Amino acid sequence: MKKTSLFENALIWFGAGVSIAEILTGTYLAPLGLKNGILAILVGHVIGCILLFLAGVIGGKMRLSAMDSTKMSFGQKGCLLFAVLNVLQLVGWTAIMIYDGALAADGIMHTGAWIWCLIIGILILVWIGVGITNLGKINTVAMVALFVLTLMLSKFIFFDGNSAVAGTEAMTFGAGVELAIAMPLSWLPLISDYTREAEEPVKASLVSSIVYGIVSCWMYLIGLGAALFTGEYDIAQIMLKAGLGIAGLLIIVFSTVTTTFLDAYSAGISNESIVPKWNGKSVAMIVTVVGTFAAIVYPMDYITDFLFLIGSVFA
């Protein structure tokens, strides 16, 4: 079976890091001010990414999926419980990410959020169909585009914006660190689904953690800077104020696709621990369809706390 290279793993986790969810989380750190906000981001990500690296090594060296690796500590029945919870939370996160991405895209181009749900869902299906070991070329193009576009966004926020406003002391430094740790920890139940496919799993775990950590910090900083320098907390308005327009739309859509793809794909892999006969890729496609449908018909604003509750089991 074809294995993924270090470069391919770096691309996968670059895509995971470029996320509107991470930008929005960065805006929440604005009460700390610029200096303390940056420090909280760095401290939180160092802690979170060390744990992410260790999780990747455990599953990667043993060529086990994230859920199968829990058998070592919790046995077969424990593994089933974790797998069911993981599939449940990943279906939920797939729906939420599609929903949030569609709302942000519709904030730039008002064609109806449901249309953007369909577009994002179809693109995720394309990513899944190509497969994790064959994504090299398509991921390279997508990541180069996202890299250039986010550089443009960073230039607007940090060099063309106003002076930073002072923090309000409404948030403790510890709370800020917790927010920064949250994103790396959210990938703990997923990372070995990808490092197990790597040619060099330990190096792939290290590269994945470092790339994700750097890019995630960058996204947090964009969010923090947007809140402090532009006074905006809405991702669509941030893009419009930056004068990005269609470019901003591409950032929103493709960052949502490259992040949510990992949720849907890992839901399929986790399901193999529950029903081994079911093909992981097929289940991932079903999860994407279900998530897209849910994002269209159900307001996703009120289930985030429930998903965080499930996710806390893995942290």
Question: PLM ranges: what are they?
Answer:
Residues 26-39, 103-117, 133-141, 235-247, ...:
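Transmembrane helix-loop boundary segments of multi-pass membrane transporters
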Residues 3-11, 76-88, 168-177, 240-255, ...:
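Select transmembrane alpha-helical segments in multipass membrane proteins
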Residues 27-57, 78-80, 212:
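Extracellular loop-to-transmembrane helix junctions
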Residues 2-4, 130-140, 166, 186-214, ...:
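Hydrophobic, small-residue-rich membrane helices and short re-entrant helix-turn-helix hairpins
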Residues 20-32, 57-59, 95-104, 126-134, ...:
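Transmembrane helix-loop junctions in multi-pass membrane proteins
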Residues 79-110, 256-273, 313:
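Hydrophobic transmembrane alpha-helices that form the core helical bundles
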Residues 12-16, 82-87, 108-130, 143-154, ...:
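Transmembrane alpha-helical segments of multi-pass small-molecule transport proteins
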Residues 1-36, 134, 172-177, 189, ...:
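Membrane-interface "cap" regions at the ends of multi-pass membrane proteins
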